[in-house]
């Protein structure tokens, strides 16, 4: 377990002064965000959350507003914080650094380790890091919050107080007796938002190690890292694979398996989303970097690269355009097909792009970078999230157990 650290020595300002200044700035920032200039973006978010009944509790409204302030991207790519700082020439360097640091908040489900003066020492069950946390409302904000309980909260750093964090927005407290439900929610959050896990550098390396081992097992089971199957057979084969993996794990830990039912062995572990289940074929690729991904109608695309004369047919042409356009699809499937069919790739793209001089070896990477800049703008991350020791214990009902959670985000092109 590591300690979360941000910033450097806070110099002449005391911690109390910094927290008080945070409270002042946050109040001004909220008022700025709720002004008419941002109404066209904030109001629809609140209305969507309220639903047709137009009911929204105060805590949820605060969370939505806080997320909007810190992380929502406006049309020009900036955040509300960016615009607030840009319009306030009266802010000194520390104020600016502090506000800009809030654009990278820590969302998590935290176990309360202990109280320490006005602070709580929290263990984030998602990234397995400890955070020394204050509230700008003072010690009173933590009244009724007890050791061993849990908080669902968002934290922002207190610049430049080393390793000091502040509650941002609403927080929800859950007693120790809620551990089972909390563990389930934390596992779901870790799986659906692996970037929260990877705030911890140790989890990144552990994730790569786990993904490499899982990919090796996948290749051994299927005989390769790429499959093209009908949807029903995809589910059947993947469930057989996961069952095989669970049985191998159980066989290696007979002391833990003896005398109790093994979770997941009697139930399907994998089910395709509806968008994929309606496809004619599913491409399954377990890449060394991009991890395990699923692609709708991949068989049709493979036919196109095998026979470039099909480029003139609208279904094939539309599908390739979709693969190039969609942000849910990485460059991986197009790279794979171009590499597998070097003798036809040039012809396919020349006809699609209407560029007779196009050569995949010279222009392919440039094309992908132009169509999918978001992919190249981010560091590669493992497709497997490694759950921390404490969350593993809670999920196992108090028994020490190491968990890995596969992140399987299917590439799902919209049907042309």
Identify the role of each PLM range.
Residues 136-154:
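Short nucleic-acid-contacting surface segments enriched for D/E, G, S/T with interspersed K/R
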Residues 100-117:
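Structural detector for short beta-strands of small beta-barrel domains
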Residues 1-91:
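A structured, charge-rich N-terminal accessory region that forms the first stable segment of a protein
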Residues 129-137:
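A short macromolecule-binding patch
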Residues 92-101:
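Short, charged beta-strand/loop "edge" motif centered at a coil->beta-strand transition
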Residues 118-123:
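Short aromatic-glycine-enriched beta-strand elements
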Residues 269, 273-416:
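Extended, amphipathic alpha-helical scaffolds
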Residues 150-332:
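Mixed-charge (acidic/basic) macromolecular-recognition segments
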């Amino acid at each position: 377990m590591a300690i979360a650290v941000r910033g450097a020595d806070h110099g002449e300002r005391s911690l109390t002064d910094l927290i008080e200044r945070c409270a002042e700035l946050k109040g001004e920032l909220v008022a700025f965000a709720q002004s008419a200039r941002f109404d066209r973006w904030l109001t629809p978010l609140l209305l969507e959350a309220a639903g047709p009944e137009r009911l929204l509790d105060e805590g949820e409204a605060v969370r939505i507003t806080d997320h909007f302030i810190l992380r929502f991207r406006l049309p020009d790519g900036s955040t509300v914080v960016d615009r607030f700082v840009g319009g306030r020439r009266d802010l000194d360097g520390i104020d600016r650094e502090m506000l800009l640091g809030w654009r990278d908040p820590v969302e998590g489900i935290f176990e309360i380790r202990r109280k320490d003066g006005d602070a709580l020492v929290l263990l984030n069950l998602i990234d397995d890091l400890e955070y020394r946390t204050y509230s700008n409302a003072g010690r009173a904000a933590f009244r009724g919050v007890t050791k061993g309980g849990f908080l669902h909260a968002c934290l922002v750093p207190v610049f430049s107080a080393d390793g000091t964090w502040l509650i941002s927005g609403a927080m929800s407290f859950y007693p120790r007796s809620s551990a089972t439900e909390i563990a389930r929610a934390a596992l779901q959050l870790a799986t659906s938002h692996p970037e929260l896990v990877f705030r911890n550098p140790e989890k990144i390396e552990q994730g790569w190690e786990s993904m490499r081992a899982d990919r090796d097992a996948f290749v051994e089971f299927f005989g390769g890292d790429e499959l093209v199957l009908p949807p029903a057979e995809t589910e059947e084969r993947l469930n057989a694979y996961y069952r095989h993996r669970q049985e191998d794990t159980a066989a290696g830990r007979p002391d833990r398996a003896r005398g109790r039912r093994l979770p997941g062995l009697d139930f399907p572990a994998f089910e395709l989303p509806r968008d994929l289940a309606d496809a004619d074929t599913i491409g399954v690729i377990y890449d060394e970097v991009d991890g395990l991904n699923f692609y709708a109608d991949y068989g049709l695309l493979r036919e196109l690269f095998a026979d470039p004369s099909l480029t003139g047919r609208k279904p094939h042409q539309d599908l390739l355009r979709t693969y190039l356009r969609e942000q849910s699809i990485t460059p991986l499937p197009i790279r794979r097909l171009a590499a597998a069919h070097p003798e036809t790739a040039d012809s396919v793209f020349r006809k699609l792009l209407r560029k007779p001089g196009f050569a995949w070896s010279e222009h392919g990477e440039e094309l992908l970078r132009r169509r999918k800049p978001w992919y190249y703008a981010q560091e590669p991350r493992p497709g497997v999230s490694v759950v921390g020791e404490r969350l593993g214990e809670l999920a196992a009902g108090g028994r020490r157990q190491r968990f890995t959670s596969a992140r399987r985000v299917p590439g799902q092109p919209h049907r042309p």
